[in-house]
Amino acid sequence: FPNVQMLPLDLRELFRDTPLADWYTAVQGRWEPYLLPVLSDASRIALMWKFGGIYLDTDFIVLKNLRNLTNVLGTQSRYVLNGAFLAFQRRHEFMALCMRDFVDHYNGWIWGHQGPQLLTRVFKKWCSIRSLAESRACRGVTTLPPEAFYPIPWQDWKKYFEDISPEELPRLLNATYAVHVWNKKSQGTRFEATSRALLAQLHARYCPTTHEAMKMYL
């Protein structure tokens, strides 16, 4: 694909001139149970701050054009946001607050504390609310409902491997921009690429090149 580039990620350079620089220096050589996902959490907010644009985890299947989404993040459940999808303008103050919160309230020993919980904390402060139910948007930042990016909760990840009729597929995902398939849970699960499993049909319809490659190994 001529419009796809693979670039190395220099974390020290990425975090330079941000609140994350000193934290990254301090964490070098220190063992923490979730350091890799924590580094991922730090990287995405730094990328959003420095460059803006759209960030997606690699376990997403995109269904619709995302270009009209700006200063948007997705709601995972009624209680928490998720940073697997982010769309922000360059140097947006919300991302600056995320970086500061990352350092000020750092705890690398709790799963999600530096990721979904951080975004939830910052959004509540941003909007001066106690519950996500109080506001979907304020001060130029919008949270979309779970069906936008997380139509199937992580607790129900096995549904991606269950059969579904082709007619039911568009109804299920009518309000969905992109589907997060919860690779942390689903990795290693086998399915037939040509089956009627929901994930197989998503690949066939929205990832035709990948789907053809998958069929070579049947």
Swiss-Prot record:
It catalyses: a beta-D-Gal-(1->4)-beta-D-Glc-(1<->1)-Cer(d18:1(4E)) + UDP-alpha-D-galactose = a globoside Gb3Cer (d18:1(4E)) + UDP + H(+); a beta-D-Gal-(1<->1')-ceramide + UDP-alpha-D-galactose = alpha-D-Gal-(1->4)-beta-D-Gal-(1<->1')-Cer + UDP + H(+). Its EC number is 2.4.1.228. GO terms for molecular function: lactosylceramide 4-alpha-galactosyltransferase activity. Keywords: Glycosyltransferase, Golgi apparatus, Lipid biosynthesis, Lipid metabolism, Membrane, Transferase. Pathway: Glycolipid biosynthesis. Its main location: Golgi. It is a single-pass type II membrane protein. GO terms for cellular component: Golgi membrane. A motif (DXD motif) lies at residues 57-59. It is an enzyme of class 2 (transferase). InterPro entries: A1-4-GlycosylTfrase_dom, Glycosyltransf_32, GlycoTrfase_DXD_sugar-bd_CS, Nucleotide-diphossugar_trans. One of its GO terms (biological process) is glycosphingolipid biosynthetic process. PANTHER family: LACTOSYLCERAMIDE 4-ALPHA-GALACTOSYLTRANSFERASE, LACTOSYLCERAMIDE 4-ALPHA-GALACTOSYLTRANSFERASE ALPHA- 1,4-GALACTOSYLTRANSFERASE. Catalyzes the transfer of galactose from UDP-alpha-D-galactose to lactosylceramide/beta-D-galactosyl-(1->4)-beta-D-glucosyl-(1<->1)-ceramide(d18:1(4E)) to produce globotriaosylceramide/globoside Gb3Cer (d18:1(4E)). Also able to transfer galactose to galactosylceramide/beta-D-Gal-(1<->1')-Cer. Globoside Gb3Cer is a glycosphingolipid of the globo serie, one of the major types of neutral root structures of glycosphingolipids, that constitute a significant portion of mammalian cell membranes. This is Lactosylceramide 4-alpha-galactosyltransferase.
